[in-house]
Regions:
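Conserved ATP-binding/catalytic motifs of P-loop helicase motor domains
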Residues: 1-183
């Protein structure tokens, strides 16, 4: 019976995460597409890829959740940087599971106005009454279900960007949510 309850807990956690993520897809940013188009006209050389321009144009049009999947070297960090550049006047927090991952994110994104934290620091130390415009979570395949639930329960972000590679090292604790969220 104990094992069944343990597995049932994993199932319940996964369902809660997926339901929270689905709820974030119900509404996008008003006039988002027009804002991005204007920004791209004003900054024609910022994004060097038509594919990334197209992604940025649609990213938050109908959803407050964006999910970026890709193997190493596919441009995930570059896309995070472009999103950050578009939201340059907004408040941004970048989180990852480990200190080296956070430092790597800081080095690649180069957003001096953003905050960079480990997931644990965000969960346990970030002020619950402080809402950020956009929360980035990098290396999502390494984020446990339990930690993801805690991040989602804080509900202190307007937009959420989840980034990762499902073939990367998995979470040490149980963490299947990022792979399942693709579907």
């Amino acid at each position: 019976m104990g094992k069944n309850l343990f597995v049932k807990g994993y199932e319940d956690d996964t369902k809660e995460i997926i339901q929270n993520l689905i709820s974030l897809t119900e509404e996008g940013v008003v006039d988002y597409n027009a804002s991005v188009e204007d920004w791209l006209i004003e900054n024609p050389n910022v994004i060097d890829s038509d594919e990334k321009r197209a992604i940025l144009l649609r990213m938050f049009e109908n959803s407050s959740l964006a999910m970026i999947y890709g193997a190493a070297g596919t441009g995930k960090s570059t896309l995070i940087k472009h999103i950050s550049q578009f939201w340059q006047d907004g408040s941004k927090v970048y989180i990852a599971n480990t200190h080296p991952a956070v430092e790597n994110l800081r080095r690649r994104v180069k957003d001096n106005s953003g905050e960079y934290l480990t997931i644990k620091k965000f969960i346990y130390s970030y002020p619950p009454d402080k809402t950020v415009d956009i929360l980035f979570i990098d290396e999502c395949s390494m984020v446990s279900n339990r930690d993801m639930i805690e991040v989602l329960r804080k509900k202190n972000f307007k937009l959420l960007v989840l980034v990762g590679d499902i073939y990367q090292i998995e979470s040490i604790q149980f963490g299947n949510w990022f792979n399942l969220a693709r579907y």
